[in-house]
C-alpha cells in the first residue's frame, strides 16, 4: 500500500467530473486500499478518488466507531453511485481533506438512498442518515467537481476566501 498525495483547493483537478469505473480488477483494489491508507493517515472520514488525482467515480467512507477507531472492515467502498432517494434537511459542520483547516455549516439532505457497486462490481443499495448521509453527499459532490465551499452562502464564502488567503500567506512565510 502507498500514501497518495491529496490535492488541495484551489486546484482545477478538483473541478473534474469523474468517469464511471468499468474495470473491477486488482489495480482498482490497490487504488481503493491506497485511498484508505491515505484517508486514515490524514485523519479523514471520507475520500473521493479525484482528491488523489484519480478521475474515477469511486469514494470511500470510514466513520469511527464508539471507541474512536476506524476499522478497515467497516470502510464503505462506493463505486459508480446513483441517487435513488433523498429526504429532509440537516445542517452539518463539514470539513474536507482538500480544504484543510476550514470548517463550516452546510445544508444537506438528512436521509439518502443510493445504488452503487462494491470492489467486486456487485450492485448494492444503501440507506443512510445523519453523518453517514452527509459524508455520502459530500463525497459524491467531489465526483461531480463540487466542493462543500461551493454550497456556502455569499457571506460564508467571503469568510472562507479571506481565511484561505491568510493561510496561504502564513505558508509562504514558513
UniProtKB/Swiss-Prot annotation:
The keyword Transport does not apply. Pfam families: Pep_deformylase (PF01327). Binds 1 Fe(2+) ion. It comes from the Bacteria. Its EC number is 3.5.1.88. InterPro entries: Peptide_deformylase, Peptide_deformylase_sf. Fe cation binds at residues 96, 138, 142. Belongs to the polypeptide deformylase family. Removes the formyl group from the N-terminal Met of newly synthesized proteins. Requires at least a dipeptide for an efficient rate of reaction. N-terminal L-methionine is a prerequisite for activity but the enzyme has broad specificity at other positions. This is Peptide deformylase.
Amino acid at each position: 500500500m502507498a500514501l497518495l498525495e491529496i490535492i488541495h483547493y484551489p486546484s482545477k483537478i478538483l473541478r473534474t467530473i469523474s468517469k464511471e469505473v468499468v474495470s473491477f480488477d486488482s489495480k482498482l483494489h490497490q487504488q481503493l486500499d491506497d485511498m484508505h491508507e491515505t484517508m486514515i493517515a490524514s485523519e479523514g472520514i471520507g475520500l473521493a478518488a479525484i482528491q488523489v488525482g484519480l478521475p474515477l467515480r469511486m469514494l470511500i467512507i470510514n466513520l469511527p466507531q464508539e471507541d474512536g477507531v476506524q476499522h478497515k472492515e467497516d470502510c464503505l467502498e462506493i463505486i459508480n453511485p446513483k441517487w435513488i432517494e433523498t429526504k429532509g434537511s440537516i445542517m452539518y459542520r463539514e470539513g474536507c481533506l482538500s480544504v484543510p483547516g476550514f470548517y463550516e455549516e452546510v445544508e444537506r439532505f438528512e436521509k439518502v438512498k443510493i445504488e452503487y457497486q462494491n470492489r467486486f462490481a456487485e450492485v448494492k443499495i444503501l440507506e443512510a442518515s445523519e453523518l453517514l448521509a452527509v459524508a455520502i453527499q459530500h463525497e459524491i459532490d467531489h465526483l461531480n467537481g463540487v466542493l462543500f465551499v461551493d454550497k456556502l452562502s455569499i457571506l460564508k464564502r467571503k469568510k472562507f476566501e479571506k481565511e484561505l488567503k491568510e493561510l496561504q500567506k502564513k505558508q509562504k512565510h514558513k
